């Protein structure tokens, strides 16, 4: 059976640029979805932390806006694509994705259909309002009500309050999903009693067919300069076994030693990670971080390959290395790992 070393941070705190402590850990969605996908694919998944301490979910990563139901998330992405053909013209930001009520677009479209509009017409109305809300930094429900000329008395059969109710319901469902994912993670035996990486011998490391590291800022604390992580990477790289990391997870690559020629083990590899543009929009990034992951990877020798815009799904596969840029890349990164491990003959080139 294919064995995956599921390498998760056990850090609970990071130090900001001003020296103050800040809570951290792993991102819940990034940890749960790939784990579930790997188990469903029939892989033997061993949860590992550097010291054997249970991993801790980053409180920021449990924020409701990182846990949109898949139907809402996919519909929002399809809406944004209708007016963001030029990503330099309409910049994708976390604020616009999370604070304007746009994630309720699918639900509002269904509401309009219940009011008698066709699916195509409802979608056109929603996309037009979303574009205005995005460009003008206004609430989606307000813009849509104005565009439809809704009367306060509901004489047109629809009110702004009904639209806002869909926005509120979408948030409530996202909050429930975040709590559900946290509960599910806490029930996984490996997350309660992980294996200590420091306890594994070279022979133990040789039994793994791949490594996967989810993100959250935690990996920058205890996985980025860790000799045991370096041992694991060296063992896998010697066999050109899949090495995969998501979002801040590529911090593990900084633990890799130099090759015989004096260059970094992954020098010249194409890869991605959470970018400085995305970091500037996070809570820790706004407070000020000691260092930035994408800069560190570039300085180490990476050929950095980020997506055309922030917050969109972007996965880079170079030989045996698989990296995903951000939380939105979670499923695609996991699927790339499954594809690599399921190939009849694993490609090392």
Task: Give the residues covered by each predicted segment.
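Catalytic nucleophile serine of serine hydrolases
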Residues: 247-249
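Active-site cofactor/cluster-binding pocket
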Residues: 242
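Extended, subdomain-level signal for the structured scaffold at the beginning of enzyme domains
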Residues: 1-98, 161-239, 251-349
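Catalytic-core signal marking the mid-to-C-terminal active-site face
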Residues: 88, 96-167
